[in-house]
Amino acid sequence: RIFRIPNHGAGAAYIEDDIYVAAMGGGYGTQFEGVGSNLTIINLEDSSNPGSLYKVIEIEDLASSDIVNSTPGSPVLITPDTATGITFTGGLIYLSDLEGKITKFNLSNLSDDGLGNRVKIFDSTTLFTVGSNKTNGRYMYHSMDATIGGTTNELWLFAGTGDFERINDTTRGVENYLLGIKDKDYPLYREIANPTKADDITKCKNTTNDTTGSKCPQNADKGWYIVLKDYAKITAEPTVYKGTAYFPVYEPTKSVNKCSLGNAYICGVDDECGTNNSSQLGQSMGKNNKCAWVGQGVLSKIVTFGDKLFANISGKVDCS
């Protein structure tokens, strides 16, 4: 994500010397602890050393986690160019990781959190944790999407979980989620928690079987989540469009032939309530995962154009 970062940090009012940088996840460290568990910022204006490191902000990992943390997904960047009503320069960044955490970074000129507490550039805080471990397989490999809720007027982040390297895994205990999480402090930056004290799934409404909106999160709730059945996993980042978040989902095959392709679904969910609106897509619905069946194979990120949904599939399609 490319943007201009304040050269003098908190409180900087002079923007002429702001620096163009690229912010990205630290990558995939696989088995090496501490490699890739960060937000990496690249200086795009260093002519003497092109592509030089501007800053690496380490993400605090969970000591109790059995997952080697990394950040393979792209960050969500909020700047005055991408959102209305913002008075700061620079940006706020949200980044998910394999441990199932969402970390918020302050890369703006904000100097106060609105409550009288000092804010510094490069500050970070853990917004949410989904409680991932190797048993439940709730890795966050993919990026998130974000929108301002039409009803709540708050920033919502959408994410999904699943072991993308072992997409056909049907080991007992695997249980993945579709998630809608709100940041009630946006557009400010506030120190919330370290990973061990961050809000978790218990602060969210379980809207798994809700098709009426009866389980819509209240103001005090952190958001909503949907439990995927039959070892299903998300296969790309969600896409939010006109009040609905669309998730590409893969359900492993139930065939005795483990080389058979599993089923690809699009789960359409109300962005603020977590209500399952997949039936509105006009496709046949899955038996247990009540999402719109697309075909057999793995779906890409869903793209919207002209009120239509588009996606690639690595298999057989059955969609009009």
Predicted feature locations:
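Beta-propeller fold recognition
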Residues: 1-320
